[in-house]
């Protein structure tokens, strides 16, 4: 199943006779505080729920540690990635945690002592979404998701990246949305971008008042360029994280930023909309925190 949710298949028609009520509003998960009433620490189990992302960014001033392994505390089991929050490190934490747990639908467990597990700090990264000037609609889904969960970000073009030789000074994470499918076969399309003899503006004018609201330029011609590739490579080597989606993954694989990784095309498999069962092979990666051994993925 998607969203890391356990579901049960019921094949008996009796289920149709059970009393039901129409869901007319957004379903909100219940949340609250349990455990020690005067705790020294709060623990929030991490289950890869996006609401915890929203909580973290909305409370960026709270000092939070993340468990690097699963553990047990006071007869409760917690996944790797679970938040550990020390009361003394945060002012008025008890009231804030109580309100946040109710708003974001999680349970905070109060405990007396710090769990015996390795941790690292949970920071709020400085995020940028990089777009080309040839295809901007697909990465709009990324912007929508970040907007919904209150994650601030800069919206930058491949030209901005090409002209900035110190991306690490501004960002911790750069997301590159899906480009056109043709890019998988020819990643140089990202490098060259649009071509033409005359400037191609994308900006508001008397005749195009609705253009350029998210980003604008005097000239869309040209792409990331080799300079941009070098800037991204330096960004990653300096500790930045560069995440690509779908077809744009041809960029790091083609230019050696993801050595040992190749894109495998499946011309006989084309099943958009399908949900497939996958297995997680690296449970120690922070990317897989909160998930079980299997995961449903959307094609």
What residues fall within each predicted segment?
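Intrinsic-disorder/low-complexity accessory segments
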Residues: 1-299
């Amino acid at each position: 199943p998607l969203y890391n949710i356990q579901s049960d298949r019921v094949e008996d028609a009796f289920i149709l006779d059970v009393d039901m009520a129409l869901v007319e509003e957004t379903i909100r998960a219940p949340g609250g505080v349990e455990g020690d009433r005067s705790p020294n620490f709060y623990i929030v189990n991490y289950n890869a729920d996006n609401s915890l992302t929203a909580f973290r960014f909305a409370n960026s001033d709270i000092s939070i540690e993340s468990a690097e392994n699963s553990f047990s505390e006071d007869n409760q089991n917690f996944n790797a990635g679970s938040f550990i929050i020390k009361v003394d490190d945060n002012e008025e934490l008890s009231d804030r945690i109580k309100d946040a747990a109710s708003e974001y639908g999680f349970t905070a467990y109060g405990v007396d002592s710090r769990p015996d597990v390795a941790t690292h700090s949970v920071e709020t990264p400085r995020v940028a979404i990089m777009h080309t000037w040839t295809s901007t609609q697909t990465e709009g889904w990324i912007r929508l998701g970040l907007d919904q969960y209150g994650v601030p970000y800069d919206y930058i073009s491949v030209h901005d990246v090409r002209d900035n030789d110190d991306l690490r000074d501004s960002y911790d994470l750069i997301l590159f949305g899906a480009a056109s499918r043709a890019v998988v076969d020819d990643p140089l399309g990202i490098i060259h971008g649009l071509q033409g003899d005359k400037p191609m503006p994308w900006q508001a004018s008397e005749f195009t008042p609705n253009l350029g609201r998210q980003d604008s330029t005097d000239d869309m011609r040209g792409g990331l360029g080799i300079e941009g590739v070098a800037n991204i490579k330096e960004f990653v080597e300096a500790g930045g994280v560069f995440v690509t989606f779908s077809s744009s993954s041809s960029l790091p694989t083609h230019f050696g930023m993801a050595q040992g990784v190749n894109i495998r095309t499946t011309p006989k498999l084309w099943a958009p909309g399908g949900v497939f069962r996958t297995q997680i092979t690296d449970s120690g990666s922070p990317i897989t925190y909160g998930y079980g051994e299997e995961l449903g993925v959307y094609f």
